[in-house]
């Protein structure tokens, strides 16, 4: 784990654009797979999806203002990350990335035996454990009672959070402009997105 975290930290520090485009491909592929699982999409479903995307994008935008990483925040990150173990198509790494704690958690893993790092990682694990216990029943009930709507909202959340993983150098407000500005800097970024896209497709086929 420590060796792997060192590699990821190196990539994040030196190849952030390539990593961002790779995650972008992962997300787009996950969205397509999840949409394919929904049968008979109606206009109301599309409206719910768009509304969910808008809500989460605004929440994440507010979260990025004066964000301070504390033990409580790391606990919340662990709590939210527990979704990745319950919900299909969501990566824990992706959730940490959009919450702005991915780099922080990896650094703490590399210095795990420091008292400070140990407390942060413990807070994260405890938050995840509480999240699993809490979310498992709620998510199970939602999928049993409102499977289609739950999937639609989940996809909307994924789409709405895309802007958080793409560097927004020109401070654009529109996700399409953010994406265009990012990929227009280097066409090689499309290649990394394609790899991410194909990875999810391959994993999905293997799982079947």
Regions found by a protein language model. Name each.
Residues 1-87, 91-208:
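Multi-pass membrane proteins that catalyze or facilitate reactions on polyprenyl-/lipid-phosphate substrates
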